[in-house]
Amino acid sequence: VHVLVTADTLTGVWTYARELVTGLASRGIRVTLVSFGEVPLPHQTAWMDTLHGLDYRPTAFRLDWMGEGEQDLKDSAAYLADLVREIRPDVAHFNQPCYGDLPISIPRIVVAHSDLISWWVAVHGQEPAESRWLRWYRDVWSRGIAGANAVVAPSSWMMRTLESCYGSPRRSKVIYNGRNPIFFNPYVTKDDSVLAVGRLWDAGKQLSLLTQRTLPLPVCIVGTDQPSVPAHLPIRADVKVATDEVCVALKGPQTEAQLRVLYSRSSIYVATSRYEPFSMSALEAAFSRCAIIANDIPSLREIWGDTAVYFRTNDPESLAEKIRLLSENGDLQRSYAGLAYSRARERFTAKRMIDEYLDLYRNLLYRSAAA
């Protein structure tokens, strides 16, 4: 079997694609991987060096939600159609739903990791104002979802949201994201500290909740673009957000090795997002045996069930209370860490994810052959 996979190098889809492609290649599946967004740096592609059966085609086509993405979508669609004719794969696995109606003769799977309209609704409480660009965006997503042979989402919440925004697909399937637990160390002695990952200014990630109340433990936010931090949060020379009430350490983007160390040493991971179709970073924290404190939103409830501690939706006071609760009760903190770790091992491994995608590929190929 030969699978064409698309990914982008700008978001967490790149991590997802690495797990997918590595898992497929390890099972003898031939993969052609096309990336969009930016041509990746060498450290982003080092994982490919030992893979057999991988043909990698980096491009700089912009994504549909980016500036000038509309023009690039036409060009990237033509590129993909030409590539399919050249390499003749058996299945197309597009991680951008806008390609679901690409005029090719093989089964087309699209995966909707997130989308602009549902992000806007979660952040602003209403749909974005109508514009020519928004009508174009909604149209290409609706056509892609209607045209695909199968539409995948990383949570049931995301699938329901997708259908309400863009219409029902011909066939839908929820396949939860997965990570390989071998990358993470759950056995390191923990520091009494809190970790969160994301940009402080990102309204969807809502990490500013961690700066609004006095907290009993040191907090580290990773992946912050310091020049974009709002002006009311003064940045000292030692790279900390410091006010009378809060002291939060900010770290710029980390390598995977650096981030794994931070996960392994932190006792608590906080998922503050008000928009989160899955949360790969929370999963990585769970594999590192961090207790998870999560915003009480439907998608995080779906993923973590009763294995996380939840704070009242978007409420900084409740978040501070839950951090205080775990900081004052080591047994409870370790119990929740163990629960999150077990749930990750049972439900969200890369192996399980690959199994489900292979089943979907085979089913679509069988239907295609029988048609």
Predicted regions and their residues:
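Active-site proximal beta-strand in glycosyltransferases
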Residues: 91, 103-127, 152
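Helix-loop-beta element that forms the nucleotide-linked donor phosphate-binding surface
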Residues: 146-147, 153, 159-179, 187
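Conserved donor-binding/catalytic core segment of Leloir-type glycosyltransferases
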Residues: 188-205, 209-223
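Membrane-proximal helix-turn-helix segments that form the acceptor-binding/catalytic region
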Residues: 130-151
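Aromatic "clamp/platform" in nucleotide-sugar-dependent glycosyltransferases that forms part
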Residues: 274
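Short alpha-helical donor nucleotide-sugar binding micro-motif in glycosyltransferases
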Residues: 145, 261-266
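Conserved acidic donor-binding segment of nucleotide-sugar-dependent glycosyltransferases
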Residues: 308-317, 325-331
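Short hydrophobic beta-strand element within catalytic cores of glycosyltransferases
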Residues: 291-294
